[in-house]
Amino acid sequence: MTIDRRALGFGGSERAVYAADPWTTRGRLYPEDDSPTRSDFQRDRDRIVHTTAFRRLKHKTQVFIAQDGDHYRTRLTHTIEVAQIARALARALKLDEDLAEGVALVHDFGHTPFGHTGEDALHEVLLPYGGFDHNAQSLRIVTKLERRYAEFDGINLTWESLEGLVKHNGPLLTPDGVGTRGPVPQPILDYCELHDLELATYASLEAQVAAIADDIAYNTHDIDDGLRSGYLTFEMLEEIPFLAGLMAEVRARYPHLEPSRFTHEIMRRQITRMVEDVIGVAQQRLSLLRPQSAADIRAADRMIATFSDAMAETDRQIKAMLFKRIYRNPDIMRIRAGAAQIVTDLFGAYMASPKEMQSHYWVDHIAGLADAPKARHVGDYLAGMTDTYAISAHRRLFDHTPDLR
């Protein structure tokens, strides 16, 4: 039976002219036959969900270590929240929802165990060998490290998905070829030699909504988790005018709410207002730009999906509060120091004796390598660990493992 792919409603019921088009993608590094029932962007999304890297997000954390409790966000729950917000934004702006969701689902693949603490520690030990960047690591995972298919390494995503993964926060190069945020990580440059991701342009609008959805999600859930842990109080939230306004609104409508419901009512309003703000800014910028294709979005001189100046200031205030009250809290700092020690110790142990990695693939793969390529493979192995696995690996190799509670 022949299936009419164009009649299946891929990517949303209606797409604007500036949306990424699943029928005219720039293809994959390794050509494949079309699916009769899914668009290329749907296939990307599905491949992302079925990876080992996606499953590992369940046991990777951002601020609160996995042992802290069952109700704190993990990388997986955060990723699902980001994907939901990204899809809502994409629908409102008539974009390809599948591409936006796929970029949101893959954006955290390269994160190490123990959140940014683990990344900082891994970057420090890898500095003599080029350092570590979680965005570049995400690219390595989906183009090299996932080994599922008979004909290629990685999961062979479309150009649009890879572009969104690499450039969702904006161009990596100026038109003159200078890094916009410092030197471009070598793994990204290496891949672009095979499949040019046009690092000097903006990404699709689908990738941009995935990026701003990430900001919305983590600001909101870090407040929620901070209140749950006791590191934040409602009084602290009232120091920020935007949050104080939301709290007053909830109190006026529900004067006797219990704390947990009060928190939820604040958080849902925060997400709604931020989403509405992004949609308003995007619509305004689109009306000025008048793009006729996704290429016009890439050629623009600024991001289209972003906060207004007022909401950007609120975003800065929230981040400053989270940094002061949570990320720099003495208890969190003690835990972070222990987590960094675990990563540093494991790197040293595996570099000195790769057999301690207890994986035939990894041991065989780095046998006889010089220090630089060996370090990169050890970094790949460490970056793929979950919090719980890293802790258990450290306990096996060392007499004392830091207490991360």
Curated annotation (Swiss-Prot):
Q: What is the organism of origin for this protein?
A: Rhizobium etli (strain CIAT 652)
A Gene Ontology molecular function term of the record: triphosphoric monoester hydrolase activity
> By its UniProt entry, which PANTHER family does this protein fall under?
BIS(5'-NUCLEOSYL)-TETRAPHOSPHATASE, SYMMETRICAL, SLR1885 PROTEIN
Read off the SMART domains from this record. HDc
Q: What is the lineage of its organism?
A: Bacteria, Pseudomonadati, Pseudomonadota, Alphaproteobacteria, Hyphomicrobiales
Listed A to Z, the keywords are: Hydrolase
- Protein name from the UniProt record: Deoxyguanosinetriphosphate triphosphohydrolase-like protein
Q: Which residues form the HD domain?
A: 75-219
Output the superkingdom of the source species: Bacteria
Family stated for the protein in its record:
Belongs to the dGTPase family. Type 2 subfamily.
Tell me which InterPro entries the record gives. Answer: dGTPase, Diverse_Catalytic_Enzymes, dNTPase_2, HD/PDEase_dom, HD_domain, PHydrolase_assoc_dom
Gene3D superfamilies, from UniProt?
Answer: Hypothetical protein af1432
